[in-house]
Amino acid sequence: MRALWVRQTSLETEESIRRMVASASTSGFNTLFVQIGNEAAGAAQTFDPVGETINQAHTAGLRVHAWLDIARVAPSGELPFARDHVIYQHPEWLMVPRALAAELLPVDVHSPDYLGRLVRWTRSNTDRIDGLYVSPALPEAASYLAEAVRDIVRRYPLDGVYLDHVRYPAADFDYGARSIAAFRDMMRGQLPLTERQRIDSVQALDPFAYPNELAEEWRSFRRAQLTALVVRLRSTAKSVRPGTVVSVAVTSDAESAERENLQDWRTWAANEFIDALCPMVTGADVTGQLSQIHALAAGRPFWAGIGANRLSQRETIDGIAAARRAGAQGIVLFSYDSLISPPKGSEFLTGIGRGAFAGS
């Protein structure tokens, strides 16, 4: 696979789509990861950029994978304009950071103040979180995400679905009242009576007693919710279109992914819960990172995500070569729009094609 991530901003007109498809094709790419926002499902449009992209790409012999944000439902910058967006309709689904949990607990979840405080905290901590996330621990939120995937795969003849942001932003997230209640209810059915009574007595003074007292179980619970979501999304996509290839963005370091983001991608690979892993590799030791992934991927294909927007043309070509040496079955470059814009320009992609894909 030789793929490009393509942002929505590159799909605004038929002509911009034509230029993008032509540029990708002539540069030797064979796949497009096309960004589709959460609001796209079911939206009424006079011009359908996704449908037009698929038509033009398939005509040119390119495959198209839908690039979907999953748990992250809104970026931390400009909030969605539409008032029927999930963050306004269901603020109770949003993950709450541990640092804000006690402050939000007495606030009515449906009051503007609740969402306002969460947004302000998110914007003041952009080094830790890049937006608003829904909790996979809540059945309604998981169903919402599954239905969004179902609708997109049903509407479009996609070749694949790339699931982005299938993770917790950090290990100290998802301390909302409903997520903690779900964990508490599960643990109450498993704990010996005396231990349950002890923690219940602590909870009378500390509403976060269950995650505090059962820290490892709390981590395992959230990790399991994320894994269950991955399984459900893949099953949903394939139930609509069996040939759909489902890939997942993963943190390249498996231990860090599990520790910091509760993203147990080794289990996903070992149990064939996904069709392909897509780690974003950074830094000088690309070969080392990808060799580790190859060793842990349990035979699952993996595609190296390369941030070419931060690299020179030579560095990008070298990164592609390193990915191939490490056993990657494909590469995905970030991103079309940044690679054709100044200071790079249109020759950047064609140069990569000549340097990395000649003879492919």
Per-region residue spans from a language model:
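Boundary/entry segment of secreted carbohydrate-active catalytic domains
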Residues: 1-20, 24, 250-253, 309-310
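Active-site-adjacent "subsite" loops/lids of carbohydrate-active enzymes
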Residues: 11-12, 66-155
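Aromatic-lined substrate-binding rim segments of carbohydrate-active enzymes
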Residues: 21, 34-72, 221-240
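Substrate-binding cleft of secreted/luminal carbohydrate-active enzymes
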Residues: 273-292, 300-360
